[in-house]
Amino acid sequence: MAKLSTDELLDAFKEMTLLELSEFVKQFEDTFGVTAAAPVAIAAGPVAGGAGGEAAAVEEQDEFDVILESVGDKKIQVIKEVRALTSLGLKEAKDLVDGAPKPVLEKVAKEAADKAKAALEGAGATVTVK
């Protein structure tokens, strides 16, 4: 297979739809074991006492799904937040919101999941993190 230059790759990406690019990113992440999520810096708070020994024994989950359960009465604000979190187009974001319950983000870090949950709940949605 001929090696493509960076410019050729960028030209190919410019011709793809957002859905095609989203699928490409997912396959790229799976193939190379990386994530395209932007790192989020959050200061760690003090750990609550009493469960220190047990918490160390249980393996901590490191990937979370953000599930949009219901929209509430501020549908437009929720669509705007979904677009900001996922880089989806207007139609795709509206379809996702209309089809609730649906996952908004999958396999993201705890900090990113908590940030997304707070943003969506601030817009009036009901959200769970699994």
UniProtKB/Swiss-Prot annotation:
Any Gene Ontology biological process: translation
Keyword Repeat: no
SUPFAM superfamilies per record: ClpS-like, Ribosomal protein L7/12, oligomerisation (N-terminal) domain
Pfam family, one: Ribosomal_L12
InterPro entries: Ribosomal_bL12, Ribosomal_bL12_C, Ribosomal_bL12_C/ClpS-like, Ribosomal_bL12_oligo, Ribosomal_bL12_oligo_N_sf
Record bears the keyword Ribonucleoprotein: yes
Cellular component GO terms held in the UniProt record: cytosolic large ribosomal subunit
CDD domains reported in the protein's UniProt record: Ribosomal_L7_L12 (cd00387)
Keywords: Ribonucleoprotein, Ribosomal protein
Single GO molecular function: mRNA binding
Function: Forms part of the ribosomal stalk which helps the ribosome interact with GTP-bound translation factors. Is thus essential for accurate translation.
Protein family: Belongs to the bacterial ribosomal protein bL12 family.
Subunit annotation: Homodimer. Part of the ribosomal stalk of the 50S ribosomal subunit. Forms a multimeric L10(L12)X complex, where L10 forms an elongated spine to which 2 to 4 L12 dimers bind in a sequential fashion. Binds GTP-bound translation factors.
HAMAP family for this protein: Ribosomal_bL12
PANTHER family listed in its UniProt record: 39S RIBOSOMAL PROTEIN L12 (PTHR45987), LARGE RIBOSOMAL SUBUNIT PROTEIN BL12M (PTHR45987:SF4)
Protein name: Large ribosomal subunit protein bL12
Gene: rplL
